[in-house]
Each structure stands twice: as C-alpha cells, then as structure tokens.
Regions:
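Structural signal for interior beta-strand "rungs" in well-ordered beta-sheet cores
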Residues: 26-27, 32-150, 154-155, 160-162
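Terminal amphipathic alpha-helical/low-complexity segments used for targeting or macromolecular assembly
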Residues: 1-36, 146-190
Length: 190
C-alpha cells in the first residue's frame, strides 16, 4: 500500500502536470513557483514571474511577466479574477511582498505592494504606485500613477484618497487574512 505522503506527492505531481499549460514560458523566461504554492485552475502565469512559499493564486488569475518581472512573496494570496502585469519602461516591474491579500478582480500594473498590505476587491493599482506595509486600499478603489499609500493608512475612492488611519484591529486583520488563505489552500490540496 502507498503511504499517505506518497499519494499526496503523486497527486501534486499529477495536478502540476494538469496545470502546466497554465504556466507559460515567454522568450527565455519561465515562471519560478515554489513547490508549496497553490495555483488554482484557470489561472495563467507567464514569463518572468516568481511566486513564493505558501502563496496562493486563485481561480482565473492572469499574472503576465512578459516585458518586465513580477514577484509575489511568501504567504501572499491573489484572489479570483485578478490581473497582474508590468511595464517595459524602467521601474515597470510589479513587486508584491509577503503576507499580502489582493482581493477578487483586482488589477495591479507595474506597482509595489509591501509586506502585510491589503488591496480590496475590485481595486486597481497603477504604474509606480506604492502600497506600504500595513496599509489598505479599500474595495473598488483606483490608486493612480505614482501615489504612495503610507503604512497605517486606508485609501478609498476613484481616484483613491486618504480616508483614515487604520485601527490596530484592521492591521491585525491583514495578517489574519493572509493566514486564513494559507489554511484555505491546504484544504484545497487535501
């Protein structure tokens, strides 16, 4: 009889093969995905992309590192329907730190989101914008070119503007959200 660990390894290898067509090389660049990361069906990951430990990419995301690079940190979750892209001009990479939550149907383009930040559902973060650690972009917001959302701030609106300082409870929620998605991806793997 096969042990449970062997069966899990076989399943992961089989599932990885099923998802291979979702992971595409662009020129000489092939995505580097940590073996502990979770990639849900329907997602497309292209080119110069690096995905960290225990990160999760949920259903129908597009992460396209063709004319620049994308880095997604450890324990970060990119939720369903999100699009992440880059710009070919200097500074056009997209960097997403560790323990970040990016909500459903977001668009991140050539921007930086630091560790333990939160981008709410349906938000857009444009070129050269920065979301600092422990900062929050409210759902449905548009963070325009070059804006910097400082640590401990919530920004909201289209275009996004400073809304308020975050409470300690809201800051804790960011970490909890990242941890919840690590647990959720484990449930999907089992």
């Amino acid at each position: 009889m096969f042990s449970e660990k062997i069966l899990l390894k076989l399943y992961k290898a089989w599932n990885h093969r099923l998802n291979m067509y979702h992971i595409l090389k662009y020129k000489d660049y092939e995505p580097k995905i940590d073996e502990s990361a979770f990639i849900a069906g329907g997602s497309r990951i292209v080119g110069k992309v690096e995905i960290g430990k225990n990160a999760s990419i949920w259903f129908n995301c597009v992460i396209r590192g063709d004319v620049g690079s994308i880095r997604i940190g450890d324990e970060t979750n990119i939720q369903d329907g999100t699009v992440i892209h880059v710009d070919r001009n200097p500074g056009g990479d997209t960097i997403i730190g560790n323990m970040v939550t990016v909500g459903h149907f977001c668009m991140l383009h050539a921007c930086t989101v630091h560790d333990k930040a939160f981008v709410g559902m349906g938000s857009t973060v444009m070129d050269h914008a920065v979301v600092e650690s422990e900062a929050m972009v409210a759902a449905g917001s548009l963070v325009t070119h070059g804006k910097v959302i400082k640590s401990g701030e919530v920004w909201a609106g289209r275009p996004a503007k400073f809304l308020k300082k975050m409470s300690d409870e809201e800051i804790k929620y960011i970490t909890q959200s990242a941890q919840n998605y690590v647990m959720l991806m484990r449930e999907y793997e089992n």
